[in-house]
């Protein structure tokens, strides 16, 4: 191989390595975003569960009050 071919090969390898490094950094950023979204999703699920329980409690209270009103009438 001539020096010119070796130089071109080296340039291409260097470009490929830089691309790989950039892709690794992007992958790490995406993993971090996914982790953040997963945590947020868990928080929202917990909040949803709490709100569902509160709604059930309020429905039971309202049903009880309506029952009292019906028995008074």
From Swiss-Prot:
Compartments, record wording: Cytoplasm
GO cellular component: cytoplasm
Xref: Pfam families: ZapB (PF06005)
Stated name of the protein: Cell division protein ZapB
The protein's assembly and partners: Homodimer. The ends of the coiled-coil dimer bind to each other, forming polymers. Interacts with FtsZ.
Coiled coil: 3-66
Family the entry assigns: Belongs to the ZapB family.
Keywords tagged on the record: Cell cycle, Cell division, Coiled coil, Cytoplasm, Septation
HAMAP family attached to this UniProt entry: ZapB (MF_01196)
Free-text function comment from the UniProt entry: Non-essential, abundant cell division factor that is required for proper Z-ring formation. It is recruited early to the divisome by direct interaction with FtsZ, stimulating Z-ring assembly and thereby promoting cell division earlier in the cell cycle. Its recruitment to the Z-ring requires functional FtsA or ZipA.
BP GO annotations: division septum assembly; FtsZ-dependent cytokinesis
């Amino acid at each position: 191989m001539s020096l010119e071919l070796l130089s071109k090969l080296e340039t291409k390898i260097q470009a490929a390595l830089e691309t790989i490094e950039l892709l690794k950094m992007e992958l790490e950023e995406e993993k971090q975003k996914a982790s953040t979204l997963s945590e947020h999703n868990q928080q929202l699920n917990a909040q949803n569960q709490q709100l569902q329980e509160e709604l059930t409690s309020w429905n039971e209270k309202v049903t009880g009050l309506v029952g009292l009103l019906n028995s008074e009438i």
